Amino acid sequence: LNPAFIPKKAEDLGFESIWYHEHPILPVTSESPFPATGGEIPWTYGHFSEPYISLAMAAAVTSKIKLATGITLVPERNPLILAKEVSVLDLHSQGRFIFGVGAGWNREETTMMGGDFDHRWTQTREAVEALKELWTKDEAEYHGRYYDFPPVYCNPKPVQKPHPPVLLGGNAKNVLQRVARWGDGWLPNRATPGQIEESRKILEALEAERGRDPGSLTISVFGQSPDTSRPVSYT
């Protein structure tokens, strides 16, 4: 699908945002079960567009619709390059980018792309910490287990301050705690309205516990089933 046509049509129809997934490769042989079914991985997962190139095309033909990754596979990317990609996309879209992040579920893919699958959320957290330094500091540096670099310049900076919103994807056991610690929102995958309601209560408690503004952590539901009656139940 043309990434210039679809976003423009979505904006004309009044949609709030458009999201691009990421899987740069899909192993021919994989022992990682597909999360939605626990079984075979759909063949479409080997045909995803590149999200940042697609969103750049979308930015060029739109002016209002928000542009988002749902999600960026952070352990598979170099944060020094990713920081620039996000900043430039946010700049040229006049602050419309939403940075949805995830750690991945396919062991073989993550490993081939240089990620540490068994500790992928720790690696993701470090990368996001490094990205925030690069986005907000004139001279940025980071020293961690997975990423370690001396002071560097990384310009331009994002339009959104202090940086584009960082939304954590998935339904991992500790995802809400992670959102409260170093995220700006949650991207639940295939969640029911009841689960969303209960999770909102937990997020509100975590906001208070960590001194964050009430209601500052967002929830954006994605990856839902094609049941057309389902969206009504969220309203």
Indicate where each model-derived feature is located.
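Active-site-adjacent structural elements that line small-molecule/cofactor binding pockets in enzymes
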Residues: 1-234
